[in-house]
């Protein structure tokens, strides 16, 4: 495989992963919206500092080569969006 074909192949793989990531984020947001409805029904605060800390700690445990602080920033944005959509 020449370099141009290799480049195209790798980019197609990245495009496929990007599509999967978007689908997973959509699924995550849907679940988050369900949680928001339940919390409102139970008269609980939508923001849960403990849960946020758990998620960020999990990043420390799971991230191998992706910079942990960058992943944490991404997840902070994901959680912020989830919270905004719950309101």
Locate each region found by the language model.
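Domain-level signature for soluble enzymes in the chorismate/prephenate branch of the shikimate pathway
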Residues: 1-87
């Amino acid at each position: 495989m020449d370099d141009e074909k290799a480049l195209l192949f790798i980019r197609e793989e990245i495009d496929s992963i990007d599509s999967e990531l978007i689908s997973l984020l959509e699924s995550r947001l849907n679940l988050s919206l369900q949680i928001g409805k339940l919390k409102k029904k139970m008269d609980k605060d939508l923001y849960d500092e403990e849960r946020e800390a758990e998620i960020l700690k999990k990043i420390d445990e799971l991230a191998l080569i992706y910079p942990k602080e960058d992943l944490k920033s991404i997840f902070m944005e994901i959680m912020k969006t989830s919270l905004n959509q719950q309101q």
